[in-house]
């Protein structure tokens, strides 16, 4: 008998690194997308925390009137924000090395671009990492598809909208009250409440909340009893058990009688796909709506659409909304322009009949 011993070649450092990066045995899966996700999200988070606490005021409108957003400059958690980059910068890429000094970079709102661009790269990489881990485990890719909805929404308000409006100063501020201000100004300038894609998004969010509550309460109400009255019902479930933990037939019968028969799902897989798809499609549509309104394809305008026989306008709810929009538009960026565009878009009145002679 002859035994042949083959000498095993040493595994290179790169191969070991690749095996570690793509291993599903790690407590936290890294993956190739993780190589981009971790540094970008850490950078965005670190810069956001520092800027929210200590960033100096930013000349957001580009008119030498800085706006303070950080805690050390008088704000609190509610009013604080990372202020968007200056309108003087517009859509120019503005990294630190493009500024003459750190003070100039801070004054023009450089941290906003740094945070937003790293954040968008990070969440896109997180989405890719979800697909990558699903692929390694032999799972279907629907987790990654579902997460594409919030990624699309974030991209719409932080990147697509500034591109459409021509300036990062029109992006959403990174704070609570700044978000609300962005929403009010967006309504004033684009009438988003009258845009059908926004309506679909509202239906997606509120409908998703309703369906989630209905599903959770139905399942909790139809659990198969495995414990006594003196024990928590949660002890009746063992992680990884093969048996159903609730009676879907009972839940189906209850809901079918409560509403009507065909309002209730009799297929658990179809039910859970619906629970995932409804809010995801709604958020997709909202992101598409914001992205189109970024280029001023705005919501429906039904202003002064009802008149009497004499031609006098009979105000409808659309006219009430329009008046509110004009009020909000007048109030924002109060020193950047004298009138909102809607009020300044009438016929041009001549102010000089003859041009003055210019002596060269």
From Swiss-Prot:
Q: Which organism is it from?
A: Trieres chinensis (Marine centric diatom)
Is Oxidoreductase one of the keywords UniProt gives this record?
yes
Q: How is it modified after translation?
A: Tyr-161 forms a radical intermediate that is referred to as redox-active TyrZ, YZ or Y-Z. C-terminally processed by CTPA; processing is essential to allow assembly of the oxygen-evolving complex and thus photosynthetic growth.
- Enumerate the residues binding [CaMn4O5] cluster: 170, 189, 332-333, 342, 344
Q: Name one GO molecular function term.
A: oxidoreductase activity, acting on diphenols and related substances as donors, oxygen as acceptor
The protein here is known as Photosystem II protein D1
Residue numbers for the site described as Tyrosine radical intermediate? 161
Please, one GO biological process term? response to herbicide
The record's annotation in SUPFAM superfamilies points to: Bacterial photosystem II reaction centre, L and M subunits
Q: Which residues are Fe cation-binding?
A: 215, 272
Q: What else is known?
A: 2 of the reaction center chlorophylls (ChlD1 and ChlD2) are entirely coordinated by water. Herbicides such as atrazine, BNT, diuron or ioxynil bind in the Q(B) binding site and block subsequent electron transfer.
Q: Does Transport appear among the keywords?
A: yes
Q: Which gene encodes it?
A: psbA
**Residues binding a quinone, per UniProt:** 215, 264-265
Which residues of this protein are annotated with the site description Cleavage? 344-345
């Amino acid at each position: 008998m002859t035994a042949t011993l083959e000498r095993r070649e040493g595994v290179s450092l790169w191969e070991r690194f690749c095996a570690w990066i793509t291993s599903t045995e790690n407590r936290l899966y890294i993956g190739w997308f993780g190589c981009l996700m971790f540094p970008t999200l850490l950078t965005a988070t670190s810069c956001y925390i520092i800027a929210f606490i200590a960033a100096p005021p930013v000349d957001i409108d580009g008119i030498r009137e800085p706006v303070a957003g950080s805690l050390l400059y008088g704000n609190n958690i509610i009013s604080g924000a990372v202020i968007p980059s200056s309108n003087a910068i517009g859509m120019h890429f503005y990294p630190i090395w493009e500024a003459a000094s750190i003070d100039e970079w801070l004054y023009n709102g450089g941290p906003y671009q740094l945070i937003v661009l790293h954040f968008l790269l990070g969440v896109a990489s997180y989405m890719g990492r979800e697909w990558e881990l699903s692929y390694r485990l032999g799972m279907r890719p629907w987790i990654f598809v579902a997460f594409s909805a919030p990624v699309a929404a974030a991209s719409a308000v932080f990147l697509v909208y500034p591109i459409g409006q021509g300036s990062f100063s029109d992006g959403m501020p990174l704070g609570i009250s700044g978000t609300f201000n962005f929403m009010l100004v967006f309504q004033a300038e684009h009438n988003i409440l009258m845009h059908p894609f926004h309506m679909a998004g509202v239906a997606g969010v509120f409908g998703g909340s309703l369906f989630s509550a209905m599903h959770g309460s139905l399942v909790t109400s139809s659990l198969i009893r495995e414990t006594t009255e003196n024990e928590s019902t949660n002890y009746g479930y063992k992680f990884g058990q093969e048996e159903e933990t609730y009676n879907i037939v009972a839940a189906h019968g209850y809901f079918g009688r409560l509403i009507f028969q065909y309002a209730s799902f009799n297929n658990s897989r179809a039910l859970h796909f619906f629970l995932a798809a409804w809010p995801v499609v709604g958020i997709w549509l909202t992101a598409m709506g914001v992205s189109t309104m970024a280029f001023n394809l705005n919501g429906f305008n039904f202003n002064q659409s009802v008149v009497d026989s004499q031609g006098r306008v009979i105000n409808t709810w659309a006219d009430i909304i329009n008046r509110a929009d004009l009020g909000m538009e007048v109030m924002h960026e109060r020193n950047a322009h004298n009138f909102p565009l809607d009020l300044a878009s009438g016929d041009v009145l001549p102010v000089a009949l003859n041009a003055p002679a210019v002596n060269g």
